Curated annotation (Swiss-Prot):
Keyword Cytoplasm in annotation: yes
InterPro entries documented for this protein: ATPase_NBD (IPR043129), Gcp-like_dom (IPR000905), KAE1/TsaD (IPR017861), TsaD (IPR022450)
Superkingdom classification of source: Bacteria
Record protein name field: tRNA N6-adenosine threonylcarbamoyltransferase
Record's keyword terms, sorted: Acyltransferase, Cytoplasm, Iron, Metal-binding, Transferase, tRNA processing
Cellular compartments annotated: Cytoplasm
Note describing how the cofactor binds: Binds 1 Fe(2+) ion per subunit.
Cofactor: Fe(2+)
Family: Belongs to the KAE1 / TsaD family.
Amino acid sequence: MEEKYLILSIESSCDETSLALFENNKLIAHKISSSASAQAFHGGVVPELASRYHEHNINRLFVDILNETKIDPLTITHVAYTAMPGLPGCLHVGKVFAKQLASLINAELVPINHLHAHVFSASIDQELVFPFLGLVVSGGESCLYLVSDYDQIKILNQTQDDAIGECYDKVARILGWNYPGGPIIDKNYQEDLATLEFIKSQPAAKNFSFSGLKTAVINYVHNSKQKKLDFDPIVIASSFQKFAINEVIKKVKYYLDLYQLKRLAIGGGVSANSLLRKKIRDLNVISYIPQMIYTGDNAAMIGAYAYALIKNHKKSILIK
C-alpha cells in the first residue's frame, strides 16, 4: 500500500504568491494571488513591491486552503517551497514561511528548483515518460534540458542575456501596451502581418539570445517616431513574435535530433503562447503541454514535482 503524503507547496519567486495542497499526486487545493496588476503601473516587476505582496498574501492563502479543505495542519507531512532561482526578497518570504510552518507542525522541508518544477508542470495531470527534452520559457529564463530522471536534469542551452518573456514585456512597453506583454502580443498576433525582419537568425547550437531582437525592435520604433513615420504596432508585434518563437522551435528541433529524443515537455509563462503551443504540437514528437493555469508561476507545479521527488527518494537539484 502506497504511503500517504500530505504536501503543502509554496511558490514566491516573482510576482505570484501561490500555495497548493497535494494528497500524494492528487491536487486538492490551489491558490494564486498575483501582484501583476500593481506591477503594471511601473511597467514591470518591482522586487520590493513583489516581496511586500508576498508578505501580505501568504498567510491569507494558507488560511484559505485550511478553510477550504478542512484539514488539520498537523497532518501535513511535507512543506515544499521554491528555493531558487528568483528575486531574493520574494524567495526569502516563501522560505521563511515554509521553515516556520514546517518547524511548528514537525513536517519535512522540501526545497525545490523553480525551473525544474516548470519542466514537470505538465505532470500535474498526466504522466511524463523519461527521457525527454525539457523547455522552459519565461520572464526570467529560456532553457533547454535533457531530462533522464527527476534528479537527472542536464542543461543543454540557456539564455545568455535577456529571457524571451522579458523581451515580450519590453516590446509591449515600447508599443504602449500594458504589463505583462506576452498575452497582449500573442492576442494581437497576425501571421500575415509578420513581415518585418529585425535581425538575422542565429545558429541553433548557440545559446538563447533575445537582447539583439529586443534592441532592434526598440530602435525601429524610436527611429520611426524621430522621423515622424507611421508604424503599425500589430505589424511590429507580429514580426517580433514570429521571429522569437521560430528561434525557440529551431533550437528544440536541433536538440531533439541531437539526442534522438521523441518526447518534449514545456513550461514557463511563455508556454502559454498560442503560436508556440501550435508549433510544438506540429512537431513529430510526444508533447507534454501544461494546462494554461499551470504555465505561469504556481504552487501546483512545486507540489507535483515535490511529490515525485519524495516518492522516489530523490532531492531537487538546487542549481540551474
